[in-house]
Amino acid sequence: MTTRIAVTGAGGRMGKILIEAVSLAGGAQLTAAIERPTSSLLGADAGELAGIGKLGVPVVGDLAEVVDGFDVLIDFTAPVATLANAKVCAAAGKGMVVGTTGFSGAEKAEFDETVTSIPVCMASNFSTGVNLCFKLLDMAASVLGDDVDIEICEAHHRHKVDAPSGTALSMGEVVANAVGRNLKDVAVYGREGQTGARERNTIGFATVRGGDVVGDHTVSFLADGERVEISHKASSRMSFGRGAVRAATWLLGKPASRYDMQDVLGLR
């Protein structure tokens, strides 16, 4: 069965990657591409926009206009836009794959309430490698526990607007849950000045922004005499695109619920 996929934010860096990823995937077809109502790209062919040749899918400025033409929406935009798109999808019974990060607490609560009636796969990172890292982090933290200091360092391109990255925060949550802590209670975001000795049982975060770094993440488990590091380095956004399309095809026909890439990959 072919999954009809819509991509929103079609003119953005990730939108173009997603369009290409859909075109390369078996069992998937791009049937809609959406941009802001004021975008100069409206009417352009989505395939030509992504640099892969004509697909016969024009970019439109209103999701509701094409909602009957797709099964699953892939949304890697911004919280406000994702919330608006969620309302349209929920009303029409369409599934969503969401890679948007940077939600405030209120925005996340509103999103969760909006999508209770549809299947949603939401993840901070759709890379297969990163999701394997989540599994490895759970194992490492469960074994090493309170015998180590835990630090998370991430690096991204200069244009990324949220910090730490959603992936870094997800890694922190995996580690915190594995050792029986609440990340909100133990996270330390950056250090400056006379900080004093490191508090045990905390999880530190460090952020780097610059250049065209797609995404680097390293979690260090530091003990006296040794350290264990689990790292992932993305060299292309296509790894995220392939994962998102895989999630979209997996989501077709699933009951209304909240899923993530651990479900898609069978890592639960």
Swiss-Prot record:
**GO biological process terms, semicolon-separated:** diaminopimelate biosynthetic process; lysine biosynthetic process via diaminopimelate
Residues annotated to bind (S)-2,3,4,5-tetrahydrodipicolinate: 157, 166-167
Listed EC numbers: 1.17.1.8
Question: Which positions are annotated as binding NADP(+)?
Answer: 36
Which residues are named in the active-site annotation? 156 (proton donor/acceptor), 160 (proton donor)
Residue runs in coiled coils: none
Q: List all disulphide bridges recorded for this chain.
A: none
Q: Where on the tree of life does the source sit, at the highest rank?
A: Bacteria
Recorded metabolic or biological pathway in which this protein acts: Amino-acid biosynthesis; L-lysine biosynthesis via DAP pathway; (S)-tetrahydrodipicolinate from L-aspartate: step 4/4
Q: Is Cytoplasm one of the keywords?
A: yes
GO molecular function (one): 4-hydroxy-tetrahydrodipicolinate reductase
Keywords in alphabetical order:
Amino-acid biosynthesis, Cytoplasm, Diaminopimelate biosynthesis, Lysine biosynthesis, NAD, NADP, Oxidoreductase
Output the InterPro entries linked to this UniProt entry: DapB_C, DapB_N, DapB_N_CS, DHDPR_bac, NAD(P)-bd_dom_sf
Residues that coordinate or bind NAD(+): 9-14, 35, 99-101, 123-126
Under catalytic activity, the entry for this protein gives: (S)-2,3,4,5-tetrahydrodipicolinate + NAD(+) + H2O = (2S,4S)-4-hydroxy-2,3,4,5-tetrahydrodipicolinate + NADH + H(+); (S)-2,3,4,5-tetrahydrodipicolinate + NADP(+) + H2O = (2S,4S)-4-hydroxy-2,3,4,5-tetrahydrodipicolinate + NADPH + H(+)
To which protein family does this belong?
Belongs to the DapB family.
Family matches, as PANTHER family:
4-HYDROXY-TETRAHYDRODIPICOLINATE REDUCTASE 1, CHLOROPLASTIC-RELATED, DIHYDRODIPICOLINATE REDUCTASE
Biological role = Catalyzes the conversion of 4-hydroxy-tetrahydrodipicolinate (HTPA) to tetrahydrodipicolinate.
The protein in question is named 4-hydroxy-tetrahydrodipicolinate reductase
* Species for this entry: Teredinibacter turnerae (strain ATCC 39867 / T7901)
